Amino acid sequence: MAPKAAEKKPVEKTPAVKKPKAEKKVPTSKEGGEKKGKKKSKKSMETYKIYIFKVLKQVHPDIGISSKAMSITNSFINDIFEKLAGESAKLARYNKKPTITSREIQTSVRLVLPGELAKHAVSEGTKAVTKFTSA
C-alpha cells in the first residue's frame, strides 16, 4: 500500500522576535565623552628650566639663555640624573639593600662623574644634605 500523504496543517505564524541591534559604544575616554564644563587637562611636563635660569642669574646676572640652549641643558640634567639613579640602584642591589640612601648617591656620583667634577659634586651634595637635615 502506498503511504498516505501526511496531512499538512497550516503553520501558525508567530511574530518574529528581532534581536536588539548592538548599540554604539560611547567612548569612555576624555576624547569623545567629555562632561560639560570640564576641559581636558594637559599633562604637565616637569623640567628644570626655572632652576637653570636661577643658577644662571646667580653666576652671570647679565647673561640670558636661548630656548634651544635651555632645552639642551634640561636634557643634559635629565640624562645625568638617569645615569646616577641607575648606578645608585645597581649599588643598592649589589649590597642587597632595599633603599637608595645618600651613601649610594655619593658613590654613584664618584663613579659616573670624572675627577674634579665628582669632588665638587660630592662636597656640594654633602653641604645640601647637611642643610636639609639641620633645618
From Swiss-Prot:
Location (main, coarse): nucleus
Presence of the UniProt keyword Iron-sulfur in the record: no
UniProt entry keywords in alphabetical sequence: Acetylation, Chromosome, DNA-binding, Isopeptide bond, Nucleosome core, Nucleus, Ubl conjugation
CDD domains, A to Z: HFD_H2B
Subcellular location field: Nucleus; Chromosome
GO cellular component, one term: nucleus
PTM section of the record: Can be acetylated to form H2BK6ac and H2BK33ac. Monoubiquitinated to form H2BK143ub1; may give a specific tag for epigenetic transcriptional activation.
InterPro entries linked to this entry: Histone-fold, Histone_H2A/H2B/H3, Histone_H2B, HISTONE_H2B_site
Summary of the tissues where the protein is detected: Expressed preferentially in meristematic tissues.
Cross-link (Glycyl lysine isopeptide (Lys-Gly) (interchain with G-Cter in ubiquitin)): 131
Sites of N6-acetyllysine modification: 8, 24
Region (Disordered), start-end ranges: 1-43
MF-aspect GO terms: DNA binding; protein heterodimerization activity; structural constituent of chromatin
Biased composition (Basic and acidic residues): 1-12, 23-35
Function: Core component of nucleosome. Nucleosomes wrap and compact DNA into chromatin, limiting DNA accessibility to the cellular machineries which require DNA as a template. Histones thereby play a central role in transcription regulation, DNA repair, DNA replication and chromosomal stability. DNA accessibility is regulated via a complex set of post-translational modifications of histones, also called histone code, and nucleosome remodeling.
Binding partners and assembly: The nucleosome is a histone octamer containing two molecules each of H2A, H2B, H3 and H4 assembled in one H3-H4 heterotetramer and two H2A-H2B heterodimers. The octamer wraps approximately 147 bp of DNA.
Additional facts recorded: Phosphorylation of H2B was not detected.
PANTHER family noted in UniProt: HISTONE H2B
Similarity comment: family membership: Belongs to the histone H2B family.
Name of the protein this chain belongs to: Histone H2B.4
Gene name as annotated: TH153
